[in-house]
């Protein structure tokens, strides 16, 4: 007869057969997860299956919506290093490109990704620093089958163990000239005061083989000319 308290409350040591089988199953699941969503996997599958978002107004948390246009945008991001996308708030486009840049940094060593907005932001709820906070949110809400990945986070900065970084920058040519990036996400470009100068300063990113993605609500000026290929 089992002793009182035996069974459900028993703690198995790491060498117990049940614990070893559980560890082996977890390792197998992690390998499958990385094969499907990791460096050699599909970034759209990662967004569709693994990414949760948070509405910055209501605080509602939900899975990223699986719209056909979102997959198309990810495919365009994979194919074209220079991308300009008009958006509406309901399209959740900024979250989409935060997610694919997170995927790039998480699974590709020594990637340097920049999130740029009109202002850097003094807190993690403002400007481009808020975009980095979204990447941290995605990181914290991945499925449990992903291997543990300890990141370094501060306002406007996210660093991965593989040497990759996501950094927040405000608009401006001086900010852009200081670095060459693997990928840049430029958000709400229609409302930047120095959009053209920043764009020119980011040319080395494209010429060096990096990606530059500009997204914005519709508006006149530089972004409209960029979308319609009328910069001259």
Regions inferred by a protein language model and the residue ranges of each:
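Phosphate/NTP-binding elements of NTP-utilizing enzymes
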Residues: 2-232
């Amino acid at each position: 007869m089992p002793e009182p308290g035996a069974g459900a409350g028993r703690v198995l040591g790491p060498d117990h057969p049940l614990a070893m089988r559980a560890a082996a199953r977890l390792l197998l699941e992690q390998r499958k997860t990385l094969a499907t969503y990791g460096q050699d996997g599909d970034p759209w599958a990662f967004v569709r299956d693994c990414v949760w978002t948070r509405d910055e107004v209501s605080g509602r948390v939900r899975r990223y919506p699986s719209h056909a246009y979102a997959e198309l945008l990810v495919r365009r991001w994979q194919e074209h290093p220079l991308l300009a996308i008009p958006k509406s708030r309901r399209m959740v486009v900024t979250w989409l490109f935060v997610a694919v840049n997170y995927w790039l940094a998480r699974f590709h060593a020594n990637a340097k990704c920049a999130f740029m907005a009109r202002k850097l932001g003094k807190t993690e709820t403002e400007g481009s620093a808020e975009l980095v906070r979204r990447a941290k949110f995605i990181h914290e809400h991945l499925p449990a089958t992903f291997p543990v990945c300890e990141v370094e986070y501060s306002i406007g900065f996210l660093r991965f163990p593989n040497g990759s970084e996501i950094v927040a920058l405000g608009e401006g040519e001086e900010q852009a000239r200081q670095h060459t990036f693997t990928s840049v996400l430029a958000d709400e470009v229609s409302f930047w005061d120095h959009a053209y100068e920043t764009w020119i300063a980011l040319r080395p990113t494209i010429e060096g083989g990096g990606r530059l993605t500009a997204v914005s609500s519709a508006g006149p000026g530089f972004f409209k000319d960029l979308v319609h290929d009328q910069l001259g």
